[in-house]
């Protein structure tokens, strides 16, 4: 497995006690498949994503990314692991208003130390992969909501991660644009063999997913299992 979250428990301070966000959660995510994690608000989906991204250290359990047990890594090593192996697609694209689509990607990968010309080629290749080859020199205000989210996805892939973590990518999009973004994520996951986790509360497009896991009250209530076929 490219990503393994094993028996993870995560708590937060809550007055005089602790609030359990994740309770002994185990999730294995294979390369080349898109695993959807669904559930209501407060079920633990975002906490699971934060732990998988190594942004939060769990109270107990293990997180293994690309064969590396993150509990054994220093803060600097975790930062390098995130940069090299983990791509994160946030709910809101948060693009820089002054930069073109291509520049958004190049800025994020600048710390890799690769030559600028190589970064430019990589950015253009990814924009082509997400259907925005003709938008490389456009700024965010010149792009639709769906196009901005596509830039967001391309940006997360700049460093060729083995793990892709996606947080509610369709929440601000209409049904048609949301379906197009999810189709794109499925295609990119298979073409690039990433282990992709998609967190969502939207059940409308589950038939596009490879596997689905259901969260409730900080636990995996079901899954991951092959995604159901959704009528209509």
What does each model-identified segment do?
Residues 61-69:
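Conserved ABC transporter NBD signature motif
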Residues 53:
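Helix-to-loop junction immediately C-terminal to a conserved catalytic motif
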Residues 99-108:
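Short coil-to-helix segment of the ABC ATPase nucleotide-binding domain corresponding to the Q-loop/switch region
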Residues 160:
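Conserved catalytic motifs of ABC-family nucleotide-binding domains
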Residues 164-167:
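Catalytic Walker B motif of ABC-type/P-loop ATPase nucleotide-binding domains
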Residues 139-143, 147-149:
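Conserved ABC ATPase signature
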Residues 16-19, 70-87:
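ABC ATPase NBD coupling module
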């Amino acid at each position: 497995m490219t990503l393994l979250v094993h028996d993870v428990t995560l708590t937060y301070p809550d007055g005089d006690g602790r609030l359990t966000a994740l309770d002994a959660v185990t999730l294995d995510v294979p390369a080349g498949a898109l695993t959807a994690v669904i559930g209501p608000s407060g079920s633990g989906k975002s906490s699971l994503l934060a732990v998988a991204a190594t942004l939060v250290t769990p109270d107990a359990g293990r997180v293994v990314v690309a064969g590396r047990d993150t509990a054994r890594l220093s803060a600097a090593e975790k930062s390098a692991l995130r940069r090299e192996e983990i791509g994160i697609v946030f709910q809101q694209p948060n693009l820089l208003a002054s930069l073109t689509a291509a520049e958004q990607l190049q800025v994020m990968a600048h710390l890799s130390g690769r030559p600028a010309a190589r970064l430019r080629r990589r950015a253009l290749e990814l924009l082509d992969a997400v259907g925005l080859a003709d938008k490389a020199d456009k700024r965010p205000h010149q792009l639709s909501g769906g196009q901005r989210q596509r830039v967001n996805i391309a940006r997360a892939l700049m460093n060729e991660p083995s793990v892709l973590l996606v947080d509610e990518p369709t929440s601000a999009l209409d049904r048609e644009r949301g379906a197009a973004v999810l189709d794109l994520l499925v295609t990119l996951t298979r073409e690039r063999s990433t282990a992709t986790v998609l967190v969502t509360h939207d059940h409308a497009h589950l038939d596009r997913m490879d596997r689905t896991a259901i969260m409730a009250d900080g636990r995996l209530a079901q899954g991951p299992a092959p995604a159901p076929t959704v009528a209509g």
